Amino acid sequence: MNLKQKYLTDVVPALMKQYGYKSIMQVPRLEKIVLNMTAGKEVTNSKAIEEVLNELTQISGQKPFQTRAKKSNASWKLREGMAMGGKVTLRRDRMWDFLEKFINVAMPRIRDFRGANPKAFDGRGNYSFGVKEEIIFPEIEFDKIRRIKGLDVQIITSVNNDKEARSLLELIGMPFSKGEK
């Protein structure tokens, strides 16, 4: 059973019972997942930008769009409008496929992983997770990358509070670290 089926058959009824929703349309749902990666120190190198875009394509299965600098920064040798990295927004089936791969394959491969930080919610029901090494994804071949880069993952939900969003992600299978709720 894939993650979308699990959501429809197990998670929706559990959340309806837990929070007393009258309609299925009130139940929290995932709206989108946004992946963001930058070239970091190699922002002036066009090959590094291409590498970022290729890796995001491999990870997400969708072509990313190039992100550009909003402001110039002399210490980073960055000029306004200069390419910095890439960004992908996943919705519907690609979102569910990515989340399943992220939870079941990539997260267990994170070095010293003890669970996702339960405090990383933004106060509006959205969850952000930073990955330090993109090589945790099986699509990325370690031999073909020049430099290890990080990746930002934002999970956007339909609810406006963190408690319900956390319940949704826990029931889907997100491994949160033990400790504060």
From Swiss-Prot:
Cysteine disulfide links: none
Alphabetic keyword roster: Ribonucleoprotein, Ribosomal protein, RNA-binding, rRNA-binding, tRNA-binding
GO MF annotation terms: rRNA binding; structural constituent of ribosome; tRNA binding
Keyword Ribonucleoprotein: yes
One Gene Ontology cellular component: ribosome
Keyword RNA-binding among UniProt keywords: yes
Origin: domain of life: Bacteria
The family this protein is said to belong to: Belongs to the universal ribosomal protein uL5 family.
HAMAP family in the cross-refs: Ribosomal_uL5_B (MF_01333_B)
Function: This is one of the proteins that bind and probably mediate the attachment of the 5S RNA into the large ribosomal subunit, where it forms part of the central protuberance. In the 70S ribosome it contacts protein S13 of the 30S subunit (bridge B1b), connecting the 2 subunits; this bridge is implicated in subunit movement. Contacts the P site tRNA; the 5S rRNA and some of its associated proteins might help stabilize positioning of ribosome-bound tRNAs.
Record's protein name: Large ribosomal subunit protein uL5
Species: Mycoplasmopsis agalactiae (strain NCTC 10123 / CIP 59.7 / PG2) (Mycoplasma agalactiae)
